[in-house]
Swiss-Prot record:
A quinone binds at residues 215, 264-265. Chlorophyll a PD1 binds at residue 198. 2 of the reaction center chlorophylls (ChlD1 and ChlD2) are entirely coordinated by water. PSII is composed of 1 copy each of membrane proteins PsbA, PsbB, PsbC, PsbD, PsbE, PsbF, PsbH, PsbI, PsbJ, PsbK, PsbL, PsbM, PsbT, PsbX, PsbY, PsbZ, Psb30/Ycf12, at least 3 peripheral proteins of the oxygen-evolving complex and a large number of cofactors. It forms dimeric complexes. Keywords: Acetylation, Calcium, Chlorophyll, Chloroplast, Chromophore, Electron transport, Herbicide resistance, Iron, Magnesium, Manganese, Membrane, Metal-binding, Oxidoreductase, Phosphoprotein, Photosynthesis, Photosystem II, Plastid, Thylakoid, Transmembrane, Transmembrane helix, Transport. Residues 345-353 form a propeptide. Tyr-161 forms a radical intermediate that is referred to as redox-active TyrZ, YZ or Y-Z. It is found in: Plastid, Chloroplast thylakoid membrane. The keyword Oxidoreductase applies. The record marks 344-345 as: Cleavage. [CaMn4O5] cluster binds at residues 170, 189, 332-333, 342, 344. It comes from Psilotum nudum. Pheophytin a binds at residue 126. This is Photosystem II protein D1. The gene is psbA.
Length: 353
């Protein structure tokens, strides 16, 4: 009898725990994805803060030339970064217990792998949590689908690209200047500016900014006034009101006359779908482009593609970009190899005499 009561009590305790985890009445929804999201993001955040402040220099290129990234080792907010795991580690899983000491783990850039892997797990679970909360509330699942774009982009630069290049040392450093360095080196090695998927991403981000500004300004300019002239029109909105807060017909008429009739949406639902889909699809394509360039399927090469009748090269902007790429290639990792791959692979010119 005692055993039966104890079993009921424990089952009830588990049931209460499940109800609390999945309750939509909590101030912040936890969910089953949140059970994994909370510890992984807390771990990534806390290790990032500690390492950004105090991590010792990291031998990123595996040539016994450590690079400093933390504030206590001479950096500021702009130049500081979590330095990627050493090329000597490559793609090996490198937890603390795989190193001979904590000093060795820090020297080889172990914190980078720890932060990145926990961060990617955390943001993936955040996306799952968005879907889970939408499901509990009877909403459609498109919030999580939209969030998949930045998740895909982060996964591309922190995981897929290092896998394709063979080392976590090629991942994006976790800092401002480190991000710029990653972008410059990526351009030098893969010519990303000439990749059509990157072009789609630029159109997605800049277009999304433009459409967001256009939509916000149109709505703000066509509010239905519920206040006197002496009060702000914004004060006329009551949270949860059933009435439309702006006149979509007026906004449609304005924009249709500004551009042309069919450039303006007359359906609020398709308008907002478009506002969400445009940047999301663009960022999906960029993430896909990074993932293909990870395996060296690079941007277009139009170098020396225009020649005159005598066979002399007429330079185009593609040749100017190529010259810049060579300069960036020469300057990065300048002690890791004697010649950049692009230059070392060119046959030596013939010398007469």
């Amino acid at each position: 009898m005692t055993a039966t009561l104890e079993r009921r009590e424990s089952a009830s305790l588990w049931g209460r725990f499940c109800n609390w985890i999945t309750s939509t009445e909590n101030r912040l929804y936890i969910g089953w994805f949140g059970v994994l999201m909370i510890p992984t993001l807390l771990t990534a955040t806390s290790v990032f803060i500690i390492a950004f402040i105090a991590a010792p220099p990291v031998d990123i290129d595996g040539i016994r030339e450590p690079v400093s990234g933390s504030l206590l080792y001479g950096n500021n907010i702009i130049s500081g970064a979590i330095i990627p795991t050493s090329a000597a580690i490559g793609l090996h899983f490198y937890p603390i217990w795989e190193a001979a000491s904590v000093d060795e783990w820090l020297y080889n850039g172990g914190p980078y792998e720890l932060i990145v892997l926990h961060f990617l797990l955390g943001v993936a679970c955040y996306m799952g949590r968005e879907w889970e909360l939408s499901f509990r509330l009877g909403m459609r699942p498109w919030i999580a689908v939209a969030y998949s774009a930045p998740v895909a982009a982060a996964t591309a630069v922190f995981l897929i690209y290092p896998i394709g290049q063979g080392s976590f040392s090629d991942g994006m450093p976790l800092g401002i200047s480190g991000t710029f360095n990653f972008m410059i080196v990526f351009q030098a090695e893969h010519n990303i500016l000439m990749h059509p998927f990157h072009m789609l991403g630029v159109a997605g981000v800049f277009g999304g900014s433009l459409f967001s500004a256009m939509h916000g300004s149109l709505v703000t300019s066509s509010l239905i006034r519920e206040t006197t002239e002496n009060e702000s029109a914004n004060a006329g909105y009551k949270f949860g009101q059933e009435e439309e807060t702006y006149n979509i017909v007026a906004a449609h008429g304005y924009f249709g006359r500004l551009i042309f009739q069919y450039a303006s949406f007359n359906n609020s639902r398709s308008l907002h779908f478009f506002l969400a889909a445009w940047p999301v699809v663009g960022i999906w394509f960029t993430a896909l482009g990074i993932s293909t360039m990870a395996f060296n399927l690079n941007g277009f090469n139009f170098n020396q593609s225009v020649v005159d009748s005598q066979g002399r090269v007429i330079n185009t902007w593609a040749d100017i970009i190529n010259r810049a790429n060579l300069g960036m290639e020469v300057m990065h990792e300048r002690n890791a190899h004697n010649f950049p791959l692009d230059l070392a692979s060119i046959e030596a010119p013939l010398v007469n005499g």
